[in-house]
Swiss-Prot record:
It comes from Corynebacterium glutamicum (strain R). A motif ('HIGH' region) lies at residues 13-23. Pfam families: Anticodon_2, tRNA-synt_1c. SUPFAM superfamilies: An anticodon-binding domain of class I aminoacyl-tRNA synthetases, Nucleotidylyl transferase. This is Glutamate--tRNA ligase. GO terms for molecular function: ATP binding; glutamate-tRNA ligase activity; tRNA binding; zinc ion binding. InterPro entries: aa-tRNA-synth_I_cd-bd (IPR045462), aa-tRNA-synth_I_codon-bd_sub2 (IPR020751), aa_tRNA-synth_I_cd-bd_sf (IPR008925), Glu-tRNA-ligase_bac/mito (IPR004527), Glu-tRNA-synth_I_codon-bd_sub1 (IPR020752), Glu/Gln-tRNA-synth (IPR000924), Glu/Gln-tRNA-synth_Ib_cat-dom (IPR020058), GluQ/Sye (IPR049940). GO terms for biological process: glutamyl-tRNA aminoacylation.
Length: 496
């Protein structure tokens, strides 16, 4: 494989289903390597499977990259010198290359059926499941004529050199496949339609891709692609053979490969749950790579400055939801307050029942109260919904109420109500001062005992944003209405 200076990588998904975290991790590593080296990222779409491909999936892939802030230098939606960038629009190109390969003798027609191949293996005492036996590569003209007379339509196979295949993988180091494991393989169907095994390397060659970074599942196909590249170079279609790097599997629970059926595999599930792009990007980068042994939190600029495919680990990476959320929490805290406020407002409006017309100045305060208390944006709803719930609709959490609204809670509730009724200017400092005096100083209660019943009374929950600030946001009237209603339910009895 040639040594290259101007890095050109590609991301070439098929538009099926929703974006998978493993797929997006592959896109991220290609993008980060292109940006780190000052190279180019080519984004093309492999949409030749009419039965499975969809425009909805295509749009979802575009949305996923844009959500994460990954751009591309050439490709769909952008254009470039190697248009078109959708395989469904490149069929004439593939037919032309296939014809050149046929004319040069690099590929040949193969008429054998699968049953005939198995029978030949059995007759020779070999495992019948060994695969194709290269029988048709040297058919005589008479044999070809006989097959044609039967009405057989051949598939087209590439002549694989009889040699062992060795290369230095960018991730895995020295890799070797023995020659007997690599029979001649099909590059075009019997109807002349080129297969992925042909069109993918042809696109890479024509788009001058220098580094192929892809999933570990494609490792066994590399010898075939290396052989095809040699053939493409001989007919003048390819200039060089790219370097290959095979990225580690992403594993799910129980050390099984993360499948599309796993909820954790869907990028948009994480987005909809309130993972922010910075947190997702950071975590995806850790699925096979790390900045340093003692630093898990980093931004996109640090990723670009430090990412090298040579540092990617070959071992499988396990997807850990708790770690993703912990990293996301750090990135939420790193946001500027105004930025966080805007993102939270947009999220709450789209994904929750939080009203879009809630006063901006109050929302700014509420956002500040929860920024350090949530791991994902969706958690803000449970913390803030009490602010937009009608007083008469507030429901007390039974478990929390049973624990905190015992007979002993009547006294702090009465004292708290009396103290708050006397507050004239309804501000956090005044609320705090009044309650501290009435409950801590005068009654001698510990804060947890003093304020537990009040917190449940205004929010319905044992956990809420800071109590005094919450009361200010809620307003004096609603605060007192709720506390008096809570007093009427104390001691709290769980309904049968």
């Amino acid at each position: 494989m040639a040594c290259m200076t101007d890095v050109r990588v590609r991301f070439c998904p098929s538009p099926t289903g929703t974006p998978h975290v493993g797929l997006v991790r592959t896109a991220l590593f290609n993008w980060a390597y292109a940006r780190h080296t000052g190279g180019k990222l080519v984004f093309r779409i492999e949409d030749t499977d009419a039965a499975r491909d969809s425009e909805e999936s295509y749009s979802a892939i575009i949305d996923s990259l844009r959500w994460l802030g990954m751009d591309w230098d050439e490709g769909v939606e952008k254009g470039g010198p190697h248009e078109p960038y959708r395989q469904s629009q490149r069929k004439d190109i593939y037919q032309d290359v296939l014809k050149q390969l046929i004319d040069a003798g690099e590929v040949y027609p193969a008429y054998s059926t699968a049953e005939e191949v198995e029978e030949r293996h059995k007759a020779a005492g070999r495992d019948p499941k060994l695969g194709y036996d290269n029988f048709d590569r040297d058919l005589t003209e008479e044999q070809v004529a006989a097959f044609e007379a039967e009405g057989r339509k051949p598939v087209w196979r590439l002549r694989m050199p009889e040699q062992d295949w060795k290369w230095t993988d960018l991730v895995r180091g020295e890799v070797e496949f023995k020659s007997f494991t690599q029979p001649d393989f099909v590059v075009a169907r019997s109807n002349g339609e080129p297969l992925y095994t042909l069109v993918n390397p042809v696109d890479d060659a024509l788009m001058e891709v220098t580094h192929v970074l892809r999933g570990e599942d494609l490792l066994p196909s590399t010898p075939r692609q290396l052989a095809l590249y040699e053939a493409l170079k001989r007919i003048g279609v390819a200039k060089v053979t790219p370097a290959f790097g095979h990225l580690p599997f992403v594993m799910g629970e129980g050390n099984k490969k993360l499948s599309k059926r796993d909820p954790q595999s869907s990028l948009f599930n994480h987005r909809d749950n309130g993972i922010i792009p910075e947190g997702m990007l950071n975590y995806l980068a850790l699925l096979g790579w790390s900045l340093s042994a003692d630093q898990d939190i980093f931004g996109v600029d640090e990723l670009i400055a430090n990412f090298d495919v040579a540092d990617v680990l070959g071992n499988p990476a396990r997807f850990d939801q708790k770690k993703l959320e912990a990293i996301n929490a750090d990135h939420i805290r790193l946001l500027e307050p105004k930025d966080f406020e805007a993102r939270l407002r947009a999220y709450m409006t789209e994904y929750t029942e939080f009203p879009a017309d809630y006063p901006a100045e109050k929302f700014a305060i509420a956002a500040e109260l929860v920024q350090t208390r949530i791991k994902v944006l969706s958690e803000a709803w449970d913390l803030l919904k009490f602010l937009v719930t009608a007083d008469e609709d507030l429901v007390l959490n039974e478990k929390a109420a049973k624990k905190n609204l015992k007979e002993t809670a009547v006294e702090p509730l009465n004292a708290g109500i009396a103290a708050l009724e006397a507050v004239e200017e309804w501000t956090t400092p005044n609320i705090e001062a009044a309650l501290n005096k009435a409950l801590i100083e005068d009654l001698g209660l510990k804060p947890r005992v003093a304020f537990g019943a009040l917190r449940i009374g205004i929010s319905g929950e044992a956990v809420s944003p800071p109590l005094f600030e919450s009361m200010e946001l809620l307003g004096k009237e609603s605060t007192l209405v709720r506390l008096k209603a809570t007093r009427e339910q104390t001691p709290f009895v769980v309904a049968e």
